[in-house]
């Protein structure tokens, strides 16, 4: 009876070790797939952003996205924005401007940000070509990027997407 209990205990131990190994492998694969980063897409975009001044004066078209970390619509749109930014990174700047950072208050006022996400779209010469308010699909974001890069008319988008209202200021 003792041999049977030992054998059963060893099998349970093997199962636990196998489970731990599988979890470790899954975490390793996840980290490798994401470049070793567990940052959210919104954090990755913010980290990759140039300053607005540099982006608007470097001879490349620019998408300025006004966002906030608490904005659910911004977080939902971030994976599509990140993929679009990666596809067009050779020809287009994507700049994130966090409306909660007092540093960007002048830009928030200048571009009359009343809801987020708000995309301000600029030509290579830094002139504003248009604005989009609310969440946009991956297809819409790609169409915007292609039009800016090719200096073609911007696509017609269907109304205002979902937004997060700005908090009241006193």
Language-model segment annotations:
Residues 75-88:
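Typically the conserved alpha-helix immediately C-terminal to a functionally engaged Cys/Sec
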Residues 1-43, 164-170:
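N-terminal targeting signals for export/organelle localization
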Residues 89-105, 135:
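Thiol-based oxidoreductase modules, predominantly thioredoxin-like and allied folds used
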Residues 70-77, 168-170:
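Short, thiol/selenol-centered motifs that function as redox-active sites or metal-ligating centers
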Residues 115, 120-165:
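Non-catalytic, surface beta->alpha helical segment in thiol-disulfide oxidoreductase systems
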Residues 42-60:
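Short extracytoplasmic/periplasmic juxtamembrane "stem" segments immediately C-terminal to an N-terminal membrane anchor
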